[in-house]
């Protein structure tokens, strides 16, 4: 029998718990009891496993022992962080009634729900990463996708047209929590993600969504946000907003707009491309040796998060890019002065979100005050920068002198963590608070005077006056002198070596002091809440200021990186093409212990495809990736690692570089490779940058070469994308002779005996050999195996000396001339014994052979 079914048999307190738990059946309930949050039944069992805490039992209710686990209330943030990191959600239930006046159990209420996508507490968030709540919706026309960063108020929606685009969006945004409809069809897209939340269909209803959003923004329609004609995106956004309100249990004033993200506004990169380019995460899942690790020397967490958003969404609007370039150029002489001041601003963006949610702690307000104190110096430094965009940022960041003055008067220099600890509001801010504090603080002087007086009166030299939280004020006398205690001393507590007493005068003073402390704390909490009321009317301007400060941090950082790492400003041109002089890989050049060999690149409508050959470890993949990374950096407005760069319009970047078996989906390396290749061939355009590395490796030589040839042909002749095509099939070096717009380049190496030296320098023309055996020897393959391989190589070369030669009949190569399969009719004839056939059987065979031809 379940606890709910046997409800009346439980104690009143457990009945209260079960009612609250029934409202939140799928998540853990932290039920406040004194100094602990308790969990019962299945919640206790789950929590003990997830948090590695003891599972105990609490007496019995309805005749059964109740499984129980508990955590101290003062350490709750640490436990919440562990649960959130595991994708769990928690309902926090607090005591809101007064135990002294309560009849029966103290009144309790769920005051907030902590979920992976709706956290705003500093202790639970990764400070340099966005933490997104997302919702996904699907109908016959495509997908709707919405994301909300509750720690900043940034609200976005999009309408991915197909599965590949939706997968790329999920990879880019990487939500901490994802809401989906109960009838969502493409479960394979989202399976395996943490923080999945199944929601009822009605939460995605379009009319409800419009109503919710208009109510949130105080508008009559959504035309002004540019999302009116995005029904799928709005369905997702409506569900997401409702969920955020339900979990926060408060208004969300910092969410004041919603933005549509359109494919045509940014360079599209699919999930494979983001992974292969190692933008913010390397192939092993870490953050080391990524593009972000090189570019991100921002000095504020909000600046770091903005830079990563830029890296994952390169913009195509050249006006925005030229403005960023101009700003970076103007700031290069000011980075040393600006960065130390910007560092002091801190994470104003997330502090403002906690202010809006009314969960900001005293130290948040102290940090906000410290940020305001930096603004006059920042504005003074920026005043001399000759740049219109910089001056626009300067105006947007504001000064907030009144708010700075308010917080300087209201909050002490170093406040405690929590307002309930008291001592947050500064002396002199409120006269009544100062009076109550004076009364409470006067206790020390009074107790000292009382102790001296009573010692003199009683003649007891061991007498002393003290206080503890359990018994309050007391007079303590040692056990040896306790028999001499005056008659008006009433025993309060007996210790091993002493007795503690109370006298009417001390009891009266205790009541007075405790009353004054309680009143001081209650007034302090009230004044603290009133500070929110004084700050929140300025929320919109404060959010604009935080955004401007984050952008300034990013641009100052990019200016510093450009100067320190010797980057150059790229030039944007109107026609498709990329021309790079002395290009370098931004990450590899930082980790090498030797000088990086810079290389040129020239792609244009007349030279659309480069067939890249050369040895393994020769630098082909590095050369290809550096081209994509230089293009990506140019399209966030950054300077780039090269001597000179001219770059035309790019709509998408595709990479087919390396692969591993996708065991979870049951796909082989070759299947993964072909899936990515199919995506490229379906979606690339003449404005796309395509990197193709070693297509066709996972199958037979003939199949692989055939596929590689056909893919290259399609990209060069039909799609006409800007393509870097690395291959070990030397037969493909014949392509430039057969198609216009295709050229050969190679990376060379020098062999000397058993050693090989890689030149890492890109040269025109095809490579002369692949150096595969030399690389194998370098890798430590046994000498006898290498020796045998050389013998076999000579045999094969003597058998087919012209394997790569072109045949007379047009574009077909000899290696592609796969022997025809034997006809079934021929096989049948070969197996036939004519001497054993009767005339009738012979006639039947003639008809059978006829059917096989």
From Swiss-Prot:
The keyword DNA damage applies. Belongs to the DNA mismatch repair MutS family. The keyword Membrane does not apply. This is DNA mismatch repair protein MutS. GO terms for biological process: mismatch repair. InterPro entries: DNA_mismatch_repair_MutS, DNA_mismatch_repair_MutS-lik_N, DNA_mismatch_repair_MutS/MSH, DNA_mismatch_repair_MutS_C, DNA_mismatch_repair_MutS_clamp, DNA_mismatch_repair_MutS_core, DNA_mismatch_repair_MutS_N, DNA_mismatch_repair_MutS_sf. SUPFAM superfamilies: DNA repair protein MutS, domain I, DNA repair protein MutS, domain II, DNA repair protein MutS, domain III, P-loop containing nucleoside triphosphate hydrolases. Pfam families: MutS_I, MutS_II, MutS_III, MutS_IV, MutS_V. ATP binds at residues 614-621. Keywords: ATP-binding, DNA damage, DNA repair, DNA-binding, Nucleotide-binding. GO terms for molecular function: ATP binding; ATP-dependent DNA damage sensor activity; damaged DNA binding; mismatched DNA binding. SMART domains: MUTSac (SM00534), MUTSd (SM00533). GO terms for cellular component: cytosol. This protein is involved in the repair of mismatches in DNA. It is possible that it carries out the mismatch recognition step. This protein has a weak ATPase activity. HAMAP family: MutS. The gene is mutS.
């Amino acid at each position: 029998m379940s606890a709910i079914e046997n409800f009346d048999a439980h104690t009143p307190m457990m009945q209260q718990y079960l009612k609250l738990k029934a409202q939140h059946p799928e998540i853990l309930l932290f039920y406040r009891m004194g100094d602990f949050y308790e969990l019962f039944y299945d919640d206790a069992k789950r929590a003990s496993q997830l948090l590695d805490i003891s599972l105990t039992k609490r007496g019995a209710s309805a005749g059964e022992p109740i499984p129980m686990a508990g955590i101290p209330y003062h350490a709750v943030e640490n436990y919440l962080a562990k649960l959130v990191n595991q994708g769990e959600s928690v309902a926090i239930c607090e005591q809101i009634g007064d135990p002294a006046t309560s009849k029966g159990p103290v009144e309790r209420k769920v005051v907030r729900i902590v979920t992976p996508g709706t956290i705003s507490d500093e202790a639970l968030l990764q400070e340099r990463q966005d933490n997104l709540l997302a919702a996904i919706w699907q109908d016959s026309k495509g997908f709707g996708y919405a994301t909300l960063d509750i720690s900043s108020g940034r609200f976005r929606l999009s309408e991915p047209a197909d599965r590949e685009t939706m997968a790329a969006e999920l990879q880019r945004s990487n939500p901490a929590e994802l809401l989906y409809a109960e009838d969502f069809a493409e479960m394979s897209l989202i399976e395996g993600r943490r923080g999945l939340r199944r929601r009822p269909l009605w939460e995605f209803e379009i009319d409800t969504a419009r109503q919710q959003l208009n109510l949130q923004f105080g508008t009559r329609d959504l035309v002004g946000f540019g999302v009116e004609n995005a029904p799928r995106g709005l369905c997702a956004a409506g569900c997401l907003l409702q969920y955020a309100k339900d979990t926060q249990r408060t208004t969300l004033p910092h969410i004041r707009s919603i933005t549509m993200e359109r494919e045509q506004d940014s360079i599209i990169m699919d999930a494979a491309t983001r992974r292969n380019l190692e933008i913010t995460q390397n192939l092993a899942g870490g953050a080391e040796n990524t593009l972000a690790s090189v570019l991100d020397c921002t000095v504020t967490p909000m600046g770091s998060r903005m830079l990563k958003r830029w890296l994952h969404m390169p913009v195509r609007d050249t006006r925005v890019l030229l403005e960023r370039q101009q700003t970076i150029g103007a700031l290069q002489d000011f980075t040393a002065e600006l960065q130390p001041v910007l560092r002091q601003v801190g994470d104003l963006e997330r502090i403002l979100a906690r202010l809006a949610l009314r969960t900001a702690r005293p130290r948040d307000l102290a940090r906000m005050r410290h940020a305001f104190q930096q603004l006059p110096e920042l504005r003074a430094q920026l005043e001399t920068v000759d740049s219109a965009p910089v001056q626009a940022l300067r105006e947007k960041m504001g000064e907030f002198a009144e708010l700075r003055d308010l917080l300087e008067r209201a909050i002490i220099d170093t406040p405690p963590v929590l307002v309930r600890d008291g001592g947050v509001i500064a002396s002199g801010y409120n006269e009544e608070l100062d009076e109550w504090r004076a009364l409470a603080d006067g206790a020390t002087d009074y107790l000292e005077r009382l102790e001296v007086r009573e010692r003199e009166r009683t003649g007891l030299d061991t007498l002393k006056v003290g206080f503890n939280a359990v018994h309050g004020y007391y007079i303590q006398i040692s056990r040896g002198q306790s028999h001499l205690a005056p008659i008006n001393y009433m025993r309060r507590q007996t210790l091993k070596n002493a007795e503690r007493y109370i006298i009417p005068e001390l009891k009266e003073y205790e009541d007075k002091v405790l009353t004054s402390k309680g009143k001081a704390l209650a007034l302090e909490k009230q004044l603290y809440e009133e500070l929110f009321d004084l700050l929140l009317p300025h929320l919109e301007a404060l959010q604009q200021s935080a955004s401007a400060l984050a952008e300034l941090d990013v641009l100052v950082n990019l200016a510093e990186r450009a100067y320190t790492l010797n980057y150059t400003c790229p030039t944007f041109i109107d026609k498709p093409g990329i021309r790079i002089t002395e290009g370098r890989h931004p990450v590899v050049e930082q980790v090498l212990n030797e000088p990086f060999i810079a290389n040129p690149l020239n792609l244009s409508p007349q030279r659309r495809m480069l067939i890249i050959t050369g040895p393994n470890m020769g630098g082909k993949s590095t050369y290809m990736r550096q081209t994509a990374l230089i293009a990506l950096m140019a399209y966030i407005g950054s300077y780039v690692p090269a001597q000179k760069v001219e770059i035309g319009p790019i709509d998408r970047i595709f990479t087919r570089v390396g692969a591993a078996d996708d065991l979870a989906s049951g796909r082989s390396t070759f299947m993964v490779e072909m899936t990515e290749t199919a995506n490229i061939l379906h979606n690339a355009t003449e404005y796309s940058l395509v990197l193709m590395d070693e297509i066709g490796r996972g199958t037979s030589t003939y199949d692989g070469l055939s596929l590689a040839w056909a893919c290259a042909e399609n990209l060069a002749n039909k799609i006409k994308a800007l393509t870097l095509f690395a291959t070990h099939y030397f037969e493909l070096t014949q392509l430039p002779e057969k198609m216009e717009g295709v050229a050969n380049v190679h990376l060379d190496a020098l062999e000397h005996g058993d050693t090989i030296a890689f030149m890492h320098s890109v040269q025109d023309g095809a490579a002369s050999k692949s150096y595969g055996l030399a690389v194998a020897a370098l890798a430590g393959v046994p000498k006898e195996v290498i020796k045998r391989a050389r013998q076999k190589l000579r045999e094969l070369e003597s058998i087919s000396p012209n394997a790569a030669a072109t045949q007379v009949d047009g574009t077909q190569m000899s290696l592609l001339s796969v022997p025809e399969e034997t006809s079934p009719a021929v096989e049948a004839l070969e197996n036939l014994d004519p001497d054993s056939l009767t005339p009738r059987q012979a006639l039947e065979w003639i008809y059978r052979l006829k059917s096989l031809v």
